[in-house]
Amino acid sequence: MQDFIYDKDSDGIVTVTMDMAGQNANTMNKRFEPGMRAVCDRLEAEPGLTGVVFASAKPTFFAGGDLHDILATETADAASFAFIEANKAVYRRLEKLPVPVVAAINGAALGGGYELCLACNHRIVLNSPKAVVGLPEVTLGLLPGAGGVVRLTARLGLEKALTYLLEGKQARPDAALADGLVDAIVDEPEALIPAAKAWIRANPDAHTQPWDQKGFRYPGGDALHPRVRQVIQVSSAMLFKKTRGLLPAPEKILDVAVNSMRMNFDAALRVETRRFIGLMASKEAKAAISTFFFGTQAIKSGKLRPEGARWQAGSAAVLGAGMMGSGIAYAHAKARLATRLNDTELARAEQGRAYSEALCDKAVARGRMEAAGKDALLSHITPATGNAAAGSTDIVIEAVFEDIELKEKVIAETWPMLSPEGIYGSNTSTLPISILAQACPDPSRFIGLHFFSPVDKMKVVEIIMGEQTSQETLRKAYDYVQQIGYMPIVVNDARGFFTSRVFGTFMDEGCQLLVDGMAPAAIERAAWLAGMPVGPLQVFDEVSLILGQKVRHTHRALDQRLGVDSGFGQHNTATVEVTDPMIAMGRGGRQYGGGFYDYDAQGTRVLWSGLEQFARGTADIPIQDAIDRILYRQAIETLRCLDEGVLNTEIEANLGGIFAIGFPAHTGGAIQFIRGEGVEAFAARARQLAASYGARFAVPDSIYDRLASREAAAA
């Protein structure tokens, strides 16, 4: 029992303190079950036992299952079933002890850790914001597999349990007590174990779980109760609307929770295990764990950041008070970063500040912000014209129109504002950073900072390294992005960088499907079925067809200026074929009154009837082909970016694609999607698409070979 400290006091109460050797947190690793089995053996044989307290020697109580073990699971086989059942058996033995068992929760108790708490008769938690409890498995593509679904449903009733099971909510002490996830709160760490022992002494007979008592009834009613039947129907419909059937975990959770109410407790636990091991081996779980847990952890921890001391900007200037500049200023103000919002006219700068005021007003109206909070936030934004004092600003971000000559002029004129240790960022979405850097006296301090619209909702920033950008500047930019609460994705300089290149292929494939003869509504439906937030035609209307045309013209002019053929957007032929004539017809997108859609005064949209004129083909395209074309087109472009060195890591490729572009989250990102399909299987399908629909799906075998080699090296 190297991981468990066993201590019996004079009252016969045993305190079992979990302290997993060589780990920062207690987890349900391979040593857990044998250790817990030994603990149960000793407890069952303990003479004069009057109660048990489970505590932790770590800063957290228990972190749950070992995700590395789950990633290594390939099949839902008998061995996996036996392993999970063995872990659950020790929890069942605990709740069968003839004495009360109390969980003394000093810190986070999540997943398998909270499932241990549910197997106890009483739960006392420390009054600390870090002492959260919950079952977040659904966010990892899993379900709680150590009795969590069955026990929480029995403890709270179906309706309340589903709010935690299907959303993966984590509750702080007050909320946990109010919702019945814990039974008591103590204010001091030193009071936890004494409080647990006091409860045991006061309740010596409270050792039988409610669900093991004769005549047990589920809170709120059983599965046949009219109210519960209504909850089941509504939950099923809402679940499909939210997941589109692309995420198996929520469906399995609902299935286990409902059916657990229709069978005996131990049978329900076995059903839970069967569903759990099926999810363990699923590509959706591996995608969620790899991308959303380990990937996000790598970025938050600074693993992908250059080494060096943390840097914090004390002052900022945003140049251009349009939609992007105003949004960036709002992000700064929320993070309490004093910001000078510049424009050529003070009225425009003040209008930019009014954008933040409007967002605050919405938050106040919804009860998410106090009036004083609004005033405090707005105090961090100063509308202005002209330069701030020389050397006074730690970070300057130009967010003027996507015109290279204008940007070069603004950069040169405003560079003097920078403090000696400051950095200068350009919010360009496609223009080469290395060329813009030529407008400033020190290109090593110049970097791309590409925000996404709307800035207040799209909390990711594409950081673009120019040819001369220093590692120190990258480190500061990385720290700045995290300072304002956004996710940094680092890429290297290239036309369109990463996000604009891939996003362009999504919209172009929508146009290509239109040209090939697919009905516009079917195109949008295919994107929805693929898991995209919205269809490519609607997206085009939102970003505007005219903007896309301007970007193409800008790059063509840049090619002429440099005497090169960059090949920017060379595969996006359908975009030109469809959108240029539409623009000539006055259909430039939503802000211009109409594009792919018509809009009425209330903003209701209907697909434009004139789209049929762009159909050149009459092929009956299978819906699965359309889905694959939408996904594979983006994945292939992402793979090209990774292979060309535009992207540095698969983590950034996956997270950047999901949060900046909207690549379907259930896949874990574009590169994880390829891995989930299997590199060989993906390549074979891409070759089929290339043969049927064009060379844009053709990728040299060498690129797939290099990806497979990266996989082998990682393994």
Predicted regions and their residues:
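Conserved CoA-thioester-binding segment of acyl-CoA-metabolizing enzymes
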Residues: 1-55, 92
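N-terminal glycine-rich phosphate-binding loop for ADP-containing cofactors
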Residues: 2-9, 19, 74, 81-85, ...
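Amphipathic alpha-helical interaction surfaces in cytosolic regulatory modules
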Residues: 31, 45, 58-72, 91
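Short, active-site-adjacent cap segments at secondary-structure transitions
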Residues: 59-63, 110-111, 431-432
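Extended, non-globular alpha-helical segments
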Residues: 69-93
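Gly/Ser-rich catalytic serine loop of serine hydrolases
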Residues: 103, 107-113
